[in-house]
Amino acid sequence: MSRYDLVERLNGTFRQIEQHLAALTDNLQQHSLLIARVFSLPQVTKEAEHAPLDTIEVTQHLGKEAEALALRHYRHLFIQQQSENRSSKAAVRLPGVLCYQVDNATQLDLENQIQRINQLKTTFEQMVTVESGLPSAARFEWVHRHLPGLITLNAYRTLTLINNPATIRFGWANKHIIKNLSRDEVLSQLKKSLASPRSVPPWTREQWQFKLEREYQDIAALPQQARLKIKRPVKVQPISRIWYKGQQKQVQHACPTPIIALINTDNGAGVPDIGGLENYDADNIQHRFKPQAQPLRLIIPRLHLYVAD
């Protein structure tokens, strides 16, 4: 497929996402809103977009106000739709839930509508990340050349739909991206970097090359069977825990956007019990279960690369 054809498909798919989201928000407003609860988080400014989040103050919204915020959030796809001071790199998050009363027919209609939106979003992400054939650093420029101001993460994010929950609870998750590597795999990566000299601010080209050579020597000095691990922290994120009484099971979802809960009164379902979201405080985290951590020694800080002792 030619690059021109891919761009045509990219634009066409995005227009469909916009149209289907507009139709969904109109459709939802035709249904009876049983309960709505969303939690707005402080906006991240451009100056603070890379700063760690030690505290997050939550503001709760209920009822029709919550619904209006949520429906607007689903269609928030461009930086032009937000304050000039807000970071375009930090994700815009609005955890919460909208609960609508449905019957069998309207439940199926909404399920199909949301499934179609999620399919389009997945297709759009596939075009950008796979079909474009571009490295991650070049994708931003390519996408924004054709869709100026697009917040790509908001375009990728699928909608979470649940049916007849008994309880919904919200909380925070601290996670790490973890990847296990062999010594030879790390050496191979460093060789590639050494073969393509460049400057990385604040270092000059020569300083950066020297830094890479030191890193290579440090890794080469390890035993071949050394266990290496990338353990990179991810910014804290809101989550939801859904309890289904009939199935006696709990399901956890990431919750960057409001969940859509359909309550089917034809099947005798009732309004779920919905909890709040507490302010986040990194110094006051309570772990339900924290397994014994493997002893690790940081060896290349910029890569978050550790060696198991």
From Swiss-Prot:
One of its GO terms (biological process) is DNA replication termination. InterPro entries: DNA_replication_term_site-bd, Tus_dom1, Tus_sf. Keywords: Cytoplasm, DNA replication, DNA-binding. It is found in: Cytoplasm. Disulfide bonds: none annotated. Gene3D superfamilies: 3.30.54.10, Replication terminator Tus, domain 1 superfamily/Replication terminator Tus (3.50.14.10). GO terms for molecular function: DNA binding. GO terms for cellular component: cytoplasm. Its main location: cytoplasm. Pfam families: Ter. Belongs to the Tus family. Trans-acting protein required for termination of DNA replication. Binds to DNA replication terminator sequences (terA to terF) to prevent the passage of replication forks. The termination efficiency will be affected by the affinity of this protein for the terminator sequence. This is DNA replication terminus site-binding protein. It comes from Salmonella typhimurium (strain LT2 / SGSC1412 / ATCC 700720).
